[in-house]
Amino acid sequence: MHAFNSTHYYTDDNEDLRYWNGTILGPMQSCFENRIYSLSIEAGERYPMEPPTVKFITKINLPSCVDQRNGYVDLGKIGVTRGWTQQNSISDVLGAIFHAMARSENRKLSQPPEGTEF
């Protein structure tokens, strides 16, 4: 399963490149299919030496890596922090989240109603 064209990110402010918006199209043949997930991404002062902070805006049930109280993604649980170098990017992070959503153990999780947010 490829994340190609299933993840996107953009900024609303070309002056401040710390804050980004992201979207993930739910993987096909999963409980996430036909859903668009919105995320907020903060590339801190140490980015790209350190990965960004990522938070789901759209409510999602993905307890293997998403804090169910606030939507923050634990990047360590999906292998993003291990081996991170300054050549890695926001695209890599979103791709790793997409692949976590596509894992067999996550494909059938019941999901909150569409349109709900953290």
Indicate where each model-derived feature is located.
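Start-of-domain signal
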Residues: 1-30
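Proline-anchored loop/turn motifs at beta-strand termini and strand-loop-strand connectors
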Residues: 42-51
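Intrinsically disordered, low-complexity N-terminal regions enriched in serine/proline/glycine
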Residues: 8-9, 18, 36, 46, ...
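Domain-scale recognition of soluble eukaryotic interaction modules
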Residues: 1, 23, 36, 51-118
